[in-house]
Amino acid sequence: MRALKMNSISVSVTHGLIFSILLFVISVAGIIINRRNILILLMSIELMLLAVNTNFLIFANMHQQAMGGVFVFFIMAVAAAETAIGLAIVVAIFRKRKTIDLSKLNTLRG
């Protein structure tokens, strides 16, 4: 079992993967359990991206390559843009409909 050394902190690859899987499972549970609130759905999707980024960093550090960090940088940039656009859409929907409950927003009204 290899250990990742980060500034005098030694984390094994197994522990990192368990953490990443736990983040991913929590985000999937958030999506499945709470389908009504659009903000919780957006946060769960961002948590999923965080789990994927953690995997990239773990495997890049394990193989001692910098490409994982580069991928994480670009994914974080895209995720930030996605979050900004998603929150802008949520604010626009809330201003027009006065709710963010997805069960009340499923009708196509003008």
UniProtKB/Swiss-Prot annotation:
Query: GO CC terms for this protein?
Result: NADH dehydrogenase complex; plasma membrane
For this protein, what reaction is catalysed? a quinone + NADH + 5 H(+)(in) = a quinol + NAD(+) + 4 H(+)(out)
Task: State its Enzyme Commission number(s).
Answer: 7.1.1.-
**Where does the protein principally reside?**
membrane
Q: What Pfam families does UniProt report for this protein, alphabetically?
A: Oxidored_q2 (PF00420)
Q: Which UniProt keywords apply?
A: Cell inner membrane, Cell membrane, Membrane, NAD, Quinone, Translocase, Transmembrane, Transmembrane helix, Transport, Ubiquinone
Q: Quote one Gene Ontology molecular function term.
A: NADH:ubiquinone reductase (non-electrogenic) activity
- Return one Gene Ontology term, BP aspect: ATP synthesis coupled electron transport
Recorded superkingdom: Bacteria
- List locations, semicolon-separated: Cell inner membrane
**Database matches in Gene3D superfamilies:** 1.10.287.3510
Describe the function of this protein: NDH-1 shuttles electrons from NADH, via FMN and iron-sulfur (Fe-S) centers, to quinones in the respiratory chain. The immediate electron acceptor for the enzyme in this species is believed to be ubiquinone. Couples the redox reaction to proton translocation (for every two electrons transferred, four hydrogen ions are translocated across the cytoplasmic membrane), and thus conserves the redox energy in a proton gradient.
The entry sums up its family as follows: Belongs to the complex I subunit 4L family.
Q: How does it assemble?
A: NDH-1 is composed of 14 different subunits. Subunits NuoA, H, J, K, L, M, N constitute the membrane sector of the complex.
- What is this protein called in UniProt? NADH-quinone oxidoreductase subunit K
Source species: Francisella tularensis subsp. holarctica (strain FTNF002-00 / FTA)
Q: What is the lineage of its organism?
A: Bacteria, Pseudomonadati, Pseudomonadota, Gammaproteobacteria, Thiotrichales
GN (gene name):
nuoK
